[in-house]
């Protein structure tokens, strides 16, 4: 409970703990989509990549040693492009990180991946959508709104 209080209350009073209570770790700094409003669409290729598991483990080990409450495995890129994403989630949970989450465009959310994510211990997944139907299809190219909705429904169904 104390970790949750620090995580939610400290920032409101412009206070900080001696170590962050939440980390955002970019599992992937690249994306398979070309959304017009997104930074990754315009980033140079030499700064796009995937976080290596050995570096991730060092970050999580230090975070766990300092009682970090939560880790989000995304920032600008699509974390599901990282083939180690499931292992990353499991490792953080094994190290007693209480909340592990990520943001995705859901384009790589296959039925198999949905099951793996549920079994990994991931606490929540946030899915980006910018409108519906044709608007979504235009902004989230090459994604298709109905296909994305079907993937989300499947994940909800098996949850």
Which residues does each predicted region cover?
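Alpha-helix-loop-beta-strand connector modules within alpha/beta enzyme cores
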Residues: 152-157
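Flexible loop/hinge segments that line or gate small-molecule binding clefts
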Residues: 131-134
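Conserved alpha-helical substructure of the radical SAM core
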Residues: 1-124, 138, 142, 146-150
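Conserved phosphate-donor/acceptor-positioning beta-strand/loop module used by diverse small-molecule
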Residues: 127-129
């Amino acid at each position: 409970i104390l970790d949750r209080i620090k995580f939610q209350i400290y920032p409101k009073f412009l206070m900080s703990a001696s170590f962050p209570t939440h980390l955002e770790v970019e599992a992937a700094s690249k994306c398979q989509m070309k959304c017009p409003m997104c930074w990754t669409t315009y980033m140079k290729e030499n700064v796009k990549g995937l976080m290596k598991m050995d570096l991730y483990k060092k970050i999580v080990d230090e975070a766990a040693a300092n009682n970090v409450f939560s880790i989000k495995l995304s920032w600008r890129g699509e974390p599901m492009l990282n083939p180690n994403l499931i292992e990353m989630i499991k490792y953080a949970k094994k190290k007693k990180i209480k909340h592990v989450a990520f943001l995705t465009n859901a384009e790589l959310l296959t039925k198999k991946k949905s099951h793996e994510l549920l079994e990994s211990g991931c606490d929540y997944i946030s899915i980006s959508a910018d409108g519906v139907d044709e608007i979504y299809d235009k902004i989230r190219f090459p994604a298709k709104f109905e296909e994305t909705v079907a993937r989300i429904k499947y994940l909800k169904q098996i949850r």
